[in-house]
Amino acid sequence: MNRSLLYPRATTTRRLIGLDGMWRFSFDPESKGVEAGWALDLPSSLSMPVPASFCDLFTDKASREYCGDFWYETSFFVPAEWSGWDIVLRFGSVTHRARVFVNGVEVAQHEGGFLPFDATVTNIVRYNQFNKLSVLANNELSETMLPAGTTRTLADGRKIAAPYFDFYNYAGIHRPVWLMALPKERVLDYSTRYRLTETGAEIDYTVSTNGPHPVTVELYDGTTRVAESSGTTGTLVVKNAKLWNVHAAYLYDLVIRIHEGSAVVDEYLDRIGIRTFEIRHGRFLLNGSPVYLRGFGRHEDADIRGRGLDLPTVKRDFELMKWIGANCFRTSHYPYAEEIYQMADEEGFLIIDEVPAVGFLQSTANFLTANQGNGRQQGFFEKETTPALLKNHKAALTDMIDRDKNHPSVIAWSLLNEPQCTSVGTEEYFKPLFELARRLDPQKRPRTYTVLMTSLPDTSKGQRFADFVSLNRYYGWYVLGGAGLADAEAAFHHEMDGWAKVLHGRPLIFTEYGTDNLSGTHKLPSVMWSAEYQNEYLEMTHAVFDHYDFVQGELVWNFADFQTTEGILRVDGNKKGIFTRQRQPKDAAYLFRERWTTLPVDFKKRKK
């Protein structure tokens, strides 16, 4: 099996053609397209950009809220000189499931909307001709998939997505599509692990190939080769190594080759950063030095393109994070586009990488009442759907770690977001996931999950598996909001005193906290939703953080306003952003800039 999640690279032995652009598009509400032959000829004149979500491009609500099957179609040309190579199609992501057809022949099926997949089409394509590429996608939700939800049928027969999560269920081909020509024998994967020495660094590596020929690995600093080794496993010894660090990212070029005599059979290039990351004595240590995390939970979300990859937006986001003094973000609530990790590698940002395990709670109302402990809840991990959910969860976790394990920016894995984890089935569900993450990751990064507001130190059955505890807390907003901030602060301290008793030397970070603010809303005296109240809340919350030495990070919710399912508690989306959806600062951005640019990197470093 030649499955590979390596990022597409053009080299002396590999060829790439990008297939992004305007494709043809059609909804298929009756799911009749396969039987009607749409894989060979899509009967539609609609055009659709790739990558992008389709939802916000239309002007009618039925199209925006469409739930069910939908089709994309384009054509691609295969050069005659590619004959004799393996021809592979590679999708960055299709939300949430996809069936892929080439010239009417089904070549791939994939479940999961946030990770890449590929299809080998060597024996199906026609060389020196145009070929038809069709994708049948589906955006329905269920309790066995990640993220979790359900699909309802309205009185008029239309389906509608009912997510258990608080972000909009954007759908489409969201990331780049590549046509690749690869050598028959090739590099399928590689991994690295780092050790710092008195004279530099050592890089232990493992290379996976699909053939018998020998492998060499070289490391370059610019045009200078600084280390080399041979074999599918080995060690690169780097003298006077330049380390990758926060906002001081240094990247080396890694070159992996397969040789047959004097010929190079395959060549794969990547950029890596030499760094170590560990937890010791209740602190996060980057290259052996303490680092206090400060930054954001985010979303892949923007006007018009929805969740589709948009490089200008990516660039703007990183410039804003640098301006405000952030050093970290969580990929809430799913793995992001690979290009975002590459940018983090280059800019020196730390990433907590999160699998799309969100919506793992249920309430008779919605996510918000469940978050407050209102409504009837049942254990989410004691249902008939749990075995299938766990299987899909393991598959997504495996793909995320396989894809992202070599990024220096990735410092930790988040295995779930806000699961209902106080019931008896929690431990049986959590244990194999945490064991799998440890087994798959050669760097043994710390593992965590974000703890729901109703999961407390004495009731959470999952926190014992985490290498560090991550709390989502809203004292002063969802709990005791408004004029009673003093009560919110007292309740917050009470809970924190409880966590102090169960951490057993582990650090704790906040992966969510914040309030909604309608940009431009000012009130004197303050009221909820105003800029003044948002700042008062943040000052109170930060004072609580600073009171506890074991608090080692703060990732505010959210970087920018983002879209959600419409409802009476959401005014055209979630407004907790420190920046607007158009990436302009709210008043709170200046509060964070003042705090984060003055906090030392090793804030709260002392620990005896």
Where are the regions a protein language model picked out?
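Secreted/periplasmic carbohydrate-active enzymes, especially glycoside hydrolases
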Residues: 1-343, 347-351, 396, 411-412, ...
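Substrate-binding/catalytic cleft of secreted carbohydrate-active enzymes
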Residues: 204-206, 318-320, 328-595, 604-605
